[in-house]
Amino acid sequence: MRFIGLVVIFLAAVTASAGPVTRIEWEENILALHAPEVPGGKVETWYLEAFCRSGSTDRDWEATVIPHTTRLVEADGDGQWVKLESMVQEGVRATHEIRVVEDGVSFALVIKNESGEAVDVDWAQPCMRVGDFTGLGQEDYFSRCFIYTRAGQVMLDRLPRVEEARYRGGQVYVPAGVDLDDVNPRPISKEVPVNNLIGCVSSDGRWILATAWDATQELFQGVINCIHADPRIGGLKAGEAKRITGRVYLVPNDSEGLLAAYERDFGK
């Protein structure tokens, strides 16, 4: 029996580190994905940067952001999962369960309006920092970033860029069906993505880092060496709760393999 117990412990250790992400941790609103094999050794995400109201495209950013706080509820001692809780002003509570999986990290959110009135909480912003991963600076890192269009995987420097907006810099890619009045007040591309994936290629060309949510407000190439797939909430009625799922993929540089993983998780 002692031998069997040792085998179980060994297999658990192997399973925990089977993929490139070996462990995760969350502290002071930063989610760190530790991945020793990839350039930079880890990927950090500002989680969460913001919860946002609708009508955001042509409005001062301060009027769009809904104040919130996030705290660590519980964490696995081996760094395989964390549980968080966000309290959003106006009576909204969000619980987050984030887990290491074989090809990255999974997110399961439940966001509930605990007030007696409808709340205009339209979308949220996790901000993934990719400067170390891509090995490039703010002016050119987007040349290693991509979305999927009708032409397939396309690097962002190959797409026409828009410059004019309430705030200059970056580029917003809006999925079909999302109101163009309700996204980031940065330049909005005329290119419509065909899925909810945005990602980038590592500086050594060996890895893809990508992110997606089942419901997405926007894909955003930002202004601090970051990329966003911003989950859509779509407002909450009094007492209403919604479930949202997301993924970070850290996989070998194979576009078809990434698409297969995305379709496994979210469908075509």
Language model features with spans:
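Bacterial N-terminal signal peptides
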Residues: 5-13
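Acidic-aromatic substrate-binding/catalytic surfaces of carbohydrate-active enzymes
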Residues: 19-72
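Beta-strand secondary-structure signal
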Residues: 32, 83, 95, 106-110, ...
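Extended, loop-rich substrate-binding clefts of extracytoplasmic carbohydrate-active enzymes
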Residues: 54-102, 122
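Beta-strand-rich recognition/accessory modules
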Residues: 75-76, 85-88, 174-268
